[in-house]
Amino acid sequence: MEKQTYSYEEAYEESLRYFQGDELAARVWVNKYAVKDSFGNIYEKSPKDMHWRIANEVARIEAKYSNPLSAEELFDLLDHFKYIVPQGSPMTGIGNNYQVASLSNCFVIGVDGEADSYGAIFKIDEEQVQLMKRRGGVGHDLSHIRPKGSPVKNSALTSTGLVPFMERYSNSTREVAQDGRRGALMLSVSIKHPDSEAFIDAKMTEGKVTGANVSVKLDDAFMTAAITGTPYIQQYPVNAAEPTVQKEINATNLWKKIVHNAWKSAEPGVLFWDTILKESVPDCYADLGYRTVSTNPCGEIPLCPYDSCRLLAINLYSYVANPFKPDAYFDFELFQKHIALAQRIMDDIIDLELEKIERIMEKIDADPESEDVKHTERILWDKIYKKSGQGRRTGVGITAEGDMLAALGLRYGTEEATEFSEKVHKTVALSAYRSSVEMAKERGAFEIYDTEREKNNPFINRLREADPQLYEDMKKYGRRNIACLTIAPTGTTSLMTQTTSGIEPVFLPVYKRRRKVNPNDTNVHIDFVDDTGDAFEEYIVFHPKFITWMETQGYDPTKRYTQDEIDALVERSPYYKATSNDVDWLMKVKMQGRIQKWVDHSISVTINLPNDVDEDLVNRLYVEAWKSGCKGCTVYRDGSRSGVLISAKNDKKEEMPPCKPPTVVETRPTILDADIVRFQNNKEKWVAFVGLLDGHPYEIFTGLQDDDEGIILPKNVTSGHIIKKVDKDGSKRYDFQFQNKRGYKVTIEGLSEKFNKEYWNYAKLISGVLRYRMPIEQVIKLVGSLQLDSESINTWKNGVERALKKYITDGTEAKGKKCPNCGNETLVYQEGCLICTTCGASRCG
C-alpha cells in the first residue's frame, strides 16, 4: 500500500494550525523534521504524525522489556512538545526508513596510540566525512599532530604543524551536505601543545577554517600561570613523561591572546580540561576506552573516541502550574516522574540506534565498491556500534529555563532564581540516575559498570551525599547508562516548544518583523519602503510565553501597541531586565557553574555581550567560569563576526581594488557543466538543470520527471553536462549528458521539447539575467516577485528559488530582510541557507 504524501503547502498549512499561527515554528518543522524521501515527497502532515511515528517505535522497543510503556502513554509525553522532546536526529530519524542515517546527534573520533602520521591524519578526515554524511556532528582533537618544524622522515624533512590540517578538516566539513546544511565540526587542542598559539590564531584570518568551531583545552596549571604571571611549559607529546619537544612560554601573554580573539571573533571557546576529566564519570573507565579527548561541535558532550550521544530535552515551562499568577508553583512530583520516563526513553533510543547502525553496516556491505574502499567506513561504524552498546550513554537535558523562571515570578540572573534553578537540576540528576539504576534491575547494567572505579568521582559522591539510598542501590544493581545528562542548545527545538532555549534567558520578549505588502491596498499600513521600491508593513511579534503573561494580566495581544506602550508592558513583566543582553553576565557564569555540578556531561551556553564591552570583561568572565567549576565557556560580542578579521601578522587593512564589472560571456559554449536539483511542483516530481560557467549559474532548464512525456533520470545523478546542438536545418536543441554507474555516457536529447512552453519561457527569462551576471540573490528576488496566476507556476517558482540559493556566495547579506527570531537585519547566506549573525537562527529552503 502506497503511503500518502503531502505537498509542502498542505504540510505547512496543517502545521500552522498545529502551532496556532506560529509561522516560524511551522516552517522549521516542515523543512527540518517532517519525513521526506530523496525526491522531496513529504509523508507527514503535522507534528502529530511525527509524534505517533516516534511513540510507536519507542513502544516497539519497550515491548522487549518488563513493564513496557504503551504507544499511547508515550504519545501523551511527546504531544505538542509539552513534556519530552527528542532533539534533532532522533526527531528526524526514529521510524524514518527513507534515509540510512544514524540517530546520534554527535560523535567524537580519534586514533589510539601514536597518531601523527599522514595516514592517521587522513584516516580521521575520512571518518569525519563518513559520519557527517549520516547526519552527525563530529569532534576531534589535534593534540596528536607534531608541532611545526619537528623532524619527519619524508621528503618535507620537517612537520608543517597542525594549522594546515585544521583547514583540511574544515574544507571536508563544508563539502558534506546534510539535508541542505553543511556538517558540524569541533576541533580542539591542548594548551600544552607547542602549536596551540597558531591554533588560537587560525580563524583570525578571513575565510580560514570557516567549517569548524574551535576550542582550546586549558589545564589548571596554565590557568594558574596565566593569572599569577608565572612561566608555563609546553611539550610534545602533550601527555608524555619524556617529551621530544619542550618550550617555556609566557602564559599571561597567551591568555591575553585567547581573550582578545574571543572578544574579536567569538572564538576560540575555552574548555577547562582538568575539570572535565576530574568530574567525568566515563573517565573512571579511561583504561577501557572511555578516556575523554574532545567534545561535540556545541561543547555539551565531552566524549571518548568512537562514542556518540543522542539528545532529548524536558520542557521545564510545562511543569509550572498556574504560570504567571500569584499562586504559580513548580510541580516537582510530576517532574520527577517524567525525568525517570525520559531516561527510560533515551535508553530505548539506544536500542533504536543500534538497529540503525546495523542497517548502515548492511548497506556498506551491500555497496558495489571493493572492500579496500569500504574498509574505513565499515570499521568506523563497527567501533561506534560496540561503544554505543557497551556504555549506553544518554543525553537527557532541558529547555525553557528562562520561561520557567519568568512563569514563577523569578527574574533570571538573580540569586533567588539561580537557587531555584540549582534545585531543579539537582532533581533532574537524582531522578535520571535513579531511573538508570531501576533499569539496571530490569534490563541489566552497562557491561563494564564497577562501583569501585567510581567511588572517588566528585559527581557520583554528590549524588551519594544527596541520596544515600540511591548510591546503595547503585552499588547493588549497577546502572544502565555510563553517563546520563547534558544541557544542549535547543535552537529549532525551542522554536517548536515555543519557549526560551536551553538554560538561556529570553532573547527579546518583543520584536518587530516586516512583511511585504501591496502599496495599493488601502487596508495596509506602509512603514518601510526599500531601495527597490518594495513596500513593507511592520508588525509586532511577542515571545509566545510573553503572550501568556499578557493574557493572565488582562492585556490584549492582538491590539496594535505604540512603542511606549510596549516598553511599559515589558517593564511590568517578569521578563524585564532578564533578556540575554540584560542579565548580569558574571551572575550567569556563576549560575552555569552551580548547575554544572548536577550535570555529568557539560553545558552549552553562550554569553551574549553588547558590542561596546571591553576585553577585560571577557577576561573576567573566563576566569570566573574556571573558578566556578564550569567545564567550558563561550562569549559572543554583538557584531563581532561581521566585518573583516585582520591577520595577526598584519594590522594594516589592504585597500580594495577598484570594482570591475562581472565578465559576461554572450556566446554560449557548446558544453556547460550542470548541476541537478530536484523539487516538488504541487504533487509532481520536477527536476532543474542548472548550467554552470566557471562555477556560476549561466542557464536553467526545468521539467517534469516521469516515465512518459517527462524526463527519465536516475535518482543518483546529481551532475553532468548540458550540450548545445545545432542541426543541419539550423534549429537548436539542448541535450543533457551524464555518466552512469558503469561509466557509460547517457544522453537525454531535446530538453526543450520535454518542457511545458509556459515554464520554458519563464526559464528563458531567468537564464537571460543569469547570463548577464545579475547577482544570484537579486535573481532570486526577481523570481520571487513574479506575479503569476497559476498555482502550479507559483510552486514551480519556489522550486527555482531553492535551486538557485545554493549558488549565493557565503556571507552575502540578505538586504532588507529581518531575522524572524531576533528581528535584526543581520541575515547572511551560508550554504544556501539564511543565517542570523546576531542570534544564530537559521532557515533553509
Question: Residue spans of the language-model regions?
Answer:
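Conserved, charged catalytic cores of large soluble enzymes
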Residues: 2-68, 72, 154-168, 178-290, ...
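Cysteine-rich micro-motifs
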Residues: 832-842
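Catalytic alpha/beta core of large soluble enzyme barrels
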Residues: 23, 299-301, 353-354, 460, ...
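Internal maturation/activation junctions in enzymes
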Residues: 74-75, 236-238, 338-385, 389, ...
